[in-house]
């Protein structure tokens, strides 16, 4: 009996070591060891002390620490913190399922960088049917906090080079590119202070997520190859999300600065700076046949939009096989635009559908209770004198559309033109139909250049 008892104790001890023992290069600092926390860089005035886990860093861009990172996440879960230290690089070369999280912090002060092994990632990823999206990893659970002064690096240049000339929404596209940061089935997620760099595709995608916030984040995507731009690198995309807050954030990318997508509610954005983007957009929605999509209860305030295609934009699909829905109760307030092609636009002829096709198969997405207030600055002049194009589909309702204190000019000349077609009721400012002969030339120019992503 003693032999069996000793054997059982030995087995139990071995299992305990396997689960709880440290892996090479790792250590755990207790929450009450303030001296050690300060020395490691984990002491933070704004965040409470926590049990802090440190893992080894990569010795080169080929040194994959995915297994170490996963171990560190599991060890820090349930009340701890994973510290990725300043001046160190952590290379991730394997897909990671992080949907088991509860009460965890990740302090990113170093660089977390994905490999650019295109064949591996295209064969090993998390796939989403919506617009054929894939991701390196996915984060889920509840009470997840990521903060620090470090960089989350998507290492996108190879992806940009190889995707050049292709289109993400082409039905024949098979070159899928990973999204940099994805949450799925997550509640109460916050991201603060970090930089998100060179995502291969969208920068952030939140799926079935509730109450997620970004504050003081810098999102940047650039290419060293002038013929291979960082396409489709949206700042924020959502699907089935309730509660998104973005504050004090800068976005310098090649697509939508902000783009809530189907079934997104309760969005708050304040102090957002966007350069070279496709705008602070709502949508697109209504893409899939027979599917109801909504975006509702959105407040966007104090936004600067520079050198982009669009400023404040709502977009919905049209065509023979599309869905239906609504964008309702959206306010854009105190929006500054400079050198922007379309400062204000309601686009119900999305995506890559010309005016003739759009007239034959109009959108079935309603735009209701949309306010544009205190919008000022200059267009690029590429659309002539048109500074706002508000054109509603004959199959949809556009009501409660209001413009207040609009001070927009165009280098193409004065007076600036606001176009409104198919809008129910008074919009609050003087506007002209696109059929007006004095505006037709500018409108035709605007729309000939608008039918693109």
Swiss-Prot record:
Annotated compartments: Secreted
Q: List the disulfide bonds.
A: 257-274, 392-398
Q: Where are the PbH1 repeats?
A: 295-316, 327-348, 362-405
Please give one Gene Ontology molecular function term for this protein: galacturan 1,4-alpha-galacturonidase activity
List the PANTHER family hit by this protein, alphabetically: EXOPOLYGALACTURONASE B-RELATED, PTHR31736
Q: Which GO terms describe its cellular component?
A: extracellular region
Which transformation does this protein catalyse, written as a reaction? [(1->4)-alpha-D-galacturonosyl](n) + H2O = alpha-D-galacturonate + [(1->4)-alpha-D-galacturonosyl](n-1)
This chain belongs to the protein called Probable exopolygalacturonase B
Kindly give the Pfam families that the UniProt entry links to this protein.
Glyco_hydro_28 (PF00295)
Q: List the glycosylation sites.
A: 185, 225, 263, 275, 302, 329, 354, 366, 436
The similarity annotation says: Belongs to the glycosyl hydrolase 28 family.
Q: Any idea which UniProt keywords this protein has?
A: Cell wall biogenesis/degradation, Disulfide bond, Glycoprotein, Glycosidase, Hydrolase, Repeat, Secreted, Signal
- The secretion signal range is 1-16
Check the record and name the InterPro entries matching this protein.
Glyco_hydro_28, Pectin_lyas_fold, Pectin_lyase_fold/virulence
Q: What is its EC number?
A: 3.2.1.67
User: Which species is this record about?
Assistant: Aspergillus fumigatus (strain ATCC MYA-4609 / CBS 101355 / FGSC A1100 / Af293)
Q: Would the keyword Repeat be found if you checked this record's keyword annotation?
A: yes
Record GO biological process: cell wall organization; pectin catabolic process
What biological function has been recorded for the protein in this entry?
A: Specific in hydrolyzing the terminal glycosidic bond of polygalacturonic acid and oligogalacturonates.
**Which of the seven top EC classes does this enzyme belong to?**
hydrolase
Does this entry carry the keyword Disulfide bond?
A: yes
Enumerate the active-site residues.
255 (proton donor), 278
